[in-house]
Amino acid sequence: MRLPADLWICLLLLAAIFGVYAQSRQFAFVNYDDPDYVTANPHVRQGITADGALWALTSTEAANWFPVTRLSHMLDVQLFGMDAGWHHLVSVLIHAAASVLLFLLLMRATGARAPSAFVAFVFALHPLHVESVAWVAERKDVLCALFWFLALWAYVRGWRALVIVAFVLGLMSKPMIVTLPLTLLLLDMWPLKRGLRLREKLPLFALAAAGAVVTIVVQKAGGAVNPAAMFGLGNALVSYVVYVAKTFWPAGLAVFYPYPERVALWHVALAVAALAAISWQAIRLRGARPYLAAGWFWFLATLLPVIGIVRVGEQARADRYMYVPMIGLAVMVAWGGTDLLRKWPRLRGALAIGACVACAGVAWAQVGYWRNSETLFAHALEVTTDNYIAEHNLGTYLTDQPGRLPEAVTHLERAVRLQPELGQAHSDLGIALAGTPGRLEDAIAEFRTAMRLRPDSEVPHINMANALAQAGRLKEAEAEYETALRMQPDAPGVKDRMARVTAEMHFQTGVALAKGGHPSEAAAELDTAVEIDPAYKDAHKTSVALAQTHYQAGIAFAQAGHPSDAAAEFQTALRFDPDFAEAHNNLGVVLSDMPGKEEEAIAQFREALRLRPEYDDARNNLQSLEERRPPGR
């Protein structure tokens, strides 16, 4: 049975995608955004729950509102737990579905199989798209694209209700879809050639405006908008050109590109000239080759929300932002190449296949960098300069790897040197220094800097308290824990840590009192330590150890012929450990040789036997003393 050509193309798409991305089944989560969205998010880690669903619908954590994306992460946890490989594969499956849907959409709209397939394969396999697919935290990209393509497909079919539903779901996945109405207008121009149907799209523009307002409000409230350098028009214009260049030569890709201190004016001028020239040519040729204008303005329009005119975040640009915009450039190449090489179909096919194979090869290598945080950020440091985010995250990862603290400190020190105002990096450097012999005071200094830079966060106070406790400055540590709890009463584990510090204070006071010759007060302090923290075993252990010390001193005094001193030491030992049978027995022995102390000695022997009925020495000593007593007593 012969399969239809479209089905073969879909199957080849799926095979190519899984050939490139199947390796991610063995990958870990990374320490950049994955903790906020999945691994350290208590709501997501519970899986699907009623409370979690309500949180997903209302949460603006991490300066974003995308409830559908949050629910998808919860569903992953519900189905697969915290197995990172399955979380990766779910993103791959969504990417595969979006790629197939893109092909079917273009086929439906244009009827041109080969160019439609080329665009779909470029979308599926381009190295710039690896970040969106291989990064668990970028689930929002693949979900947004899937709903975007569904809305376009429904529009081509004339199913208006589905267009609205898909658009709303897309907005709830990632607000970048706000430009959907513009892409529908471009479809009207080409390939549908319907003329502009603006009126029917007014509800979609209203939804887009609402989504844009929500996004701006949430990101400003979450601190994602950089108020010190809010507008970045120069970098935005240059970035458009860089994105085009990276599409055709995807080398030196990294998870983070540092924002430049300044953008050279001549770079901006060249970018403006290039963008204007291409735009003018696209408009000029809109009659003969309308796909050029449709593709070019798709690229410009869909990239506009994230191009950085209003700065959101610290990055200059990001590979993931090209996930949907690249389709416009691919359309220009696919249909333009078809026209230019119409007389050479074999050459056209060979070039298309070669381009797709090259994309797949580079993408496969790029996917490999996402294996874990070390491979990801080490590669970023190789292909970028002054990358403080890569230094910071690599250092944080290495802090948790056995025997690699010196490397961690090196990377974290570079991070704070490159970006002195990065409070989290100072905090993480402090953690690494606290684990480095002889660097505890340096760690405390870093935590002080972090507290200054992050005055609204309880985390630096917790880290400071941990370091102060490690340094033995327990009263100061207790005060920092109290500050952290005032700022965040539900801060995980802080109450337990503060209890341990308070218990340690009583424990150390007890030890000091014991050494100072105040056993009763010492025992009371040790008991208080146990009352505060029942898991605080050291108090009991120390009490027994101190009892043993005084017991041995008593033995030494007895052997040296100093019974009074021996009795005092045995009595002190019993204050620390009242159930010390040997101390009762030996106290009885020294008391039995003291005039008028026979009854006290007998009481000590009897207590030793009560504690240890099989204690033969105590029994023999008791019998011997009772036989020596005068009759009638």
Regions from the language model: what does each represent?
Residues M1-I431, R452, N463:
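Polytopic membrane enzymes that build or remodel cell-surface glycoconjugates and lipids
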